[in-house]
């Protein structure tokens, strides 16, 4: 698993770089959000498959699917006009929910070394949806929550993923916390 972390980081950085709009127009931001979310979904499924972790790939697919179904259901239940007025499917952001589901799945299965850059790309997707006039910040925040919950609730840690813990300690004179991680 460790041998595929570097290519994963390269893929995430490439996704982020490619999704940065060359022109700060609503269409440029929309294109950037598409590239970001589809790249994240591909990495969240492809990275486990590259490491022969079919369970991890399946968990990523189910996480993204669950987030997408919930977001779509809410769009139909609570129609809200988009900032650009194009339709009434603003709430919540489906792009953001899918991006955060993929990022949470990567973080849970691969560890923080892959998860943190994945969440950075997911955050960029949310920003791009707002800048592209497709969503309000509230739509993006709810989408991020849906995706994160789906990813973290459905995905299980890989046995080789870096693990960390926060331990409380104390005695009669002092108290504190100890953070431990395995490299």
Language model features with spans:
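Hydrophobic core of alpha-helical transmembrane segments in multi-pass integral membrane proteins
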Residues: 40-47
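Interfacial segments of alpha-helical transmembrane regions
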Residues: 47-66
């Amino acid at each position: 698993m460790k041998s595929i972390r570097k290519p994963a980081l390269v893929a995430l950085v490439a996704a982020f770089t490619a999704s940065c709009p060359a022109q700060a127009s609503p269409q440029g931001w929309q294109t950037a959000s598409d590239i970001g979310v589809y790249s994240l979904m591909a990495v969240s499924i492809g990275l486990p498959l590259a490491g022969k972790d079919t369970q991890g790939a399946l968990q990523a697919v189910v996480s993204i699917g669950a987030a997408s179904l919930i977001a779509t259901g809410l769009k139909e239940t609570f129609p809200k006009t988009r900032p650009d007025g194009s339709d009434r499917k603003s709430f919540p952001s489906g792009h953001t929910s899918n991006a955060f589901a993929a990022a949470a799945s990567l973080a849970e299965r691969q560890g923080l070394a892959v998860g943190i850059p994945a969440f950075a790309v997911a955050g960029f997707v949310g920003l791009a949806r707002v800048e592209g006039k497709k969503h309000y910040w509230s739509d993006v925040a709810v989408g991020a929550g849906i995706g994160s919950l789906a990813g973290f609730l459905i995905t299980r840690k890989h046995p080789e993923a870096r693990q960390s813990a926060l331990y409380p300690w104390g005695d009669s004179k002092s108290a504190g916390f100890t953070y431990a991680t395995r490299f």
